[in-house]
Amino acid sequence: MIQHIDVHQVLQESLSSVYADLVTRPTGRVVRERIESVMAAARHPVAVARMDFTGVGCIDYSCADEIVAKLLRGAGRAILLLSGISDGHREAIEPVLAGHGLAVLIERRDGKLEALGAPEAAAALLDELVARRLAARTPGGTVALTLA
């Protein structure tokens, strides 16, 4: 099962209906805890948690660490997949993950997947997706989800 999490909506529900930026560690902690609650409340086992960042203005390093890195450490068997990622989001998330030796999946606009973070962790993540039959390698060498 793929669980969809609207990060912008979680941010608005957690803090303020007009807040669009993920900045400061306390903000990140509140948002992460809310996301963890949503994931824990799922009725069926979650294979992939798609976190949609559409509508999120910016994310700083502390929020990238507090949300993405900590969720990766505590996600269990669920694979985190980030969508709606801007170049600015990527610039904050990538060095945080690389520093922790972690990787996360990014879903590009064309539906293809790429791993972001530490190179070894990124390669292992893509291999795990294929091994678990959650994704398949395409003839062009990219990876695409097989789950709907």
Region annotations inferred by a language model:
Residues 117-132:
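Short amphipathic alpha-helical interaction segments
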Residues 1-21:
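N-terminal presequence-like segments and adjacent domain-start helices
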Residues 140-148:
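Short, cationic-aromatic polyanion-contact patches
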Residues 102-103, 121-125, 145-146:
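Short glycine/proline-centered loop/turn elements that form peptide/ligand docking sites
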Residues 12, 19-48, 53-104:
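Amphipathic alpha-helical interaction surfaces in cytosolic regulatory modules
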Residues 108-113:
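Conserved alpha/beta core segments of nucleic-acid transaction machinery
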Residues 130-140:
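A short, conserved structural fragment
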